[in-house]
Amino acid sequence: MNIPEIIHGIWLGGRIPLKLKNYRRSWKRYHRDWEFKLWTEDNLPELENQTLYDKAITYAEKSDVVRLEVLKEFGGVYADMDYSCIRNITPLIEDADFFIVQDGKIWKKNHPRYGIPYLNNAFIGCTPNHRLIKLLVDSLPGFALENKDYHVCFRTGPGFVSQMLKDEDILRLENWKIRRKYAKHHYENSWKDIEPQPRPWPED
């Protein structure tokens, strides 16, 4: 497999809820030989986009910064803490050097710029220093500034990766196909009380 057998998770602020710990354990159950890295405020690597991280209002935005940079440095698979695993994902990604989950066929209604595939950085992986992960790390500060008045989902999260990767030939794991066989996103949205989720939300 091209992508390193590493599964990254990020938790910033407070204790990890038991439900999320159980989701995390599900990955270990089906990937016993893989390395697991849980990034917290106590062990973050040196960040290229440290200024953006420091200025971020929400933990979601901070996490968006960190996930791209740890993937650039180490490679591997990043899964949000509210993703649970149903079986080993190797068959899904064994021939890929970059993948991302696709939540919907297109963005709808929310944003005039996003009539494009709805990609989600909640589940993403690559080889170290992959061209596209470098593109995302390099482009994030400018994009976030340009879209500073939009919701975090648009300025640093799914909206950002959707816009940057819309024309790239990459492996897109269709969420509606994998969620009953490999991995399920539970959409806990632990950050939504700080910055409420926008409505309407993109539809399939």
What kind of feature is each model-predicted range?
Residues M1-D64, A79-D204:
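Glycosyltransferase-associated regions of secretory-pathway enzymes
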Residues D64-G76:
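Small-residue hinge/turn detector
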